[in-house]
Amino acid sequence: MKNKLDLSLYLVASQGNKSEECFLNTLENAIKGGVSIIQLREKELNAREFYKLGLKVQKLCKAYKIPFLINDRVDIALALDADGVHLGQEDLEVKLARKLLGDEKIIGLSLKKLEQLEFIQGANYLGCGAIKATPTKESSLLSLELLSQICDKSPIGVVAIGGVDKAVLDELKGINLSGVAVVRAIMDAKDAFLAAKELKRKIYENLPLK
């Protein structure tokens, strides 16, 4: 799967205040609109709740044949036999996660400094940001200049994350990205299908999708 990884429209999903039914409907409509990969990010749930929700999201992703990743929790990814995991700089090292998960799983890594490119061995893609301030990333923004430098030097695909919406996609035009990761632009939209469809159109207009 990692050799055919479509990162173009990457959805980072959290249930938040939505009912489970509403949450899953939002994800399904987003997939129909063009989301190509989903990462389940649940900081507030305990392991058992995370696992149970993960089973349902995984079933949905399998039905539409898109990759399903878990944020941070290698143990949950293993328990679910998810397609992979996304790790932050303070999470388990990539080489250890790779040893646990095996060669066929997808591992993404958050990165925001050029010097961190020296330590990405074993990762399949990078998530770089935040591009704009968000409720979860209020500080430590990544400049577009630095994002562009990281994209040009990275041997693996790079996804921009953090406050990305349709307007931001115009600012990202020409940067050597493999895709963008969104949260609120889809999860808070009145119509997740239309939101995803419009984002996908803008992605194809503005990004080379290397």
Swiss-Prot record:
UniProt KW keywords: Magnesium, Metal-binding, Thiamine biosynthesis, Transferase
Cofactor or coenzyme needed: Mg(2+)
EC number: 2.5.1.3
Signal sequence interval, chain numbering: none
GO molecular function: magnesium ion binding; thiamine-phosphate diphosphorylase activity
Cofactor note (record): Binds 1 Mg(2+) ion per subunit.
Pathway assigned in UniProt: Cofactor biosynthesis; thiamine diphosphate biosynthesis; thiamine phosphate from 4-amino-2-methyl-5-diphosphomethylpyrimidine and 4-methyl-5-(2-phosphoethyl)-thiazole: step 1/1
Reactions performed catalytically: 2-[(2R,5Z)-2-carboxy-4-methylthiazol-5(2H)-ylidene]ethyl phosphate + 4-amino-2-methyl-5-(diphosphooxymethyl)pyrimidine + 2 H(+) = thiamine phosphate + CO2 + diphosphate; 2-(2-carboxy-4-methylthiazol-5-yl)ethyl phosphate + 4-amino-2-methyl-5-(diphosphooxymethyl)pyrimidine + 2 H(+) = thiamine phosphate + CO2 + diphosphate; 4-methyl-5-(2-phosphooxyethyl)-thiazole + 4-amino-2-methyl-5-(diphosphooxymethyl)pyrimidine + H(+) = thiamine phosphate + diphosphate
Protein name: Thiamine-phosphate synthase
Organism whose genome encodes this protein: Campylobacter jejuni subsp. jejuni serotype O:23/36 (strain 81-176)
